[in-house]
Amino acid sequence: MRISLVTPPSQNVEPYIKVFESKGVKVDHNSIHPDADFIMMTTQAWLHLVDNFHNTFPDIPIVSLTLDFYKSIWNSPNPHGYNWNLYKHYLNKAEELWCISNEVITRMEEEGIDKDKCHLMKIWARFFEYEGEIKDDRYILKTIRPYKYDKNYGWLERACSELNIPLKQPNHGASEQEYHKLLAECSFMCSEYHETSTGGLGILEGYKLGKVSVVSDSPYHGAIDYLGDRAIYFDDKNNEKIKQIIKETWNNTPQPDLEDCINFCNNHPTIDDNVDFMIERMNIIKKRGQIE
């Protein structure tokens, strides 16, 4: 099998290439070969390549690893110049959509995209073994990057300011070593947005170290798929509720059983599981095409 993988730089997507090739799948990264079996798109970024490849080789089927699909982004200013209608066009054209949470599936269905083409594939997390001391240094950690157009943007910062609680936000600017230390030494984490496909995988990586997360109970928050009832939820409809939950969690910070946290995270899909799933789905599509 041979695929054209179209993706901008991504610490969770680019590592797939090596795993695909270890399993006998040739990957052309942001390029295409006439013998490709599939064009795999991943996001609205670099859609011009998908468009170019499809126009050059219109008979090569498209599949989509759909990482996110946010209404708040569609309706916001568009500084990157994304072509949303073209993105939706190719999602509709794709043979299958592999979605990393039910939030993604729900939003796409609301935009008229065929839900029957969607398959849930929870994305792998970058778990690590921490050699230092896991402790509570009394600060809240927000691992997810700023979503400035989300309706809940600023809720956490305002709550922490009013409660005089330290908040750390690396905004993807910390080194890997610094990031691991931030996770290992926080009191707990928070992912307050209304709309996010996973809640930020840091909430899962931190949970393996025994750190809990406060998250929105929005139906468009993907943490429910990744942490389930192991997260602490606040009422997404009321910005005062996050302040109340933050205060309660700060004053009585949960300390879950570390072994149980580790076992839970060890059952999360690995990068190999993700690649095996995608290969299996592509083989099914190929067989389906032969029958038709």
For the regions a protein language model found, what residue spans apply to each?
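Short beta-strand->alpha-helix junction loop in the catalytic core
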Residues: Y70, E103, L120-E131, F264
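Membrane-proximal helix-turn-helix segments that form the acceptor-binding/catalytic region
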Residues: P77-L97, A184
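Conserved donor-binding/catalytic core segment of Leloir-type glycosyltransferases
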Residues: R126, E131-K151, E157-C160
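A charged, aromatic-enriched C-terminal amphipathic alpha-helix characteristic of glycosyltransferases
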Residues: Y130, K237, N251-I291
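Acidic donor-binding loop of glycosyltransferase active sites
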Residues: K181-T198, K211
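Short hydrophobic beta-strand element within catalytic cores of glycosyltransferases
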Residues: V212-S216
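Conserved acidic donor-binding segment of nucleotide-sugar-dependent glycosyltransferases
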Residues: G228-N239, K247-P254
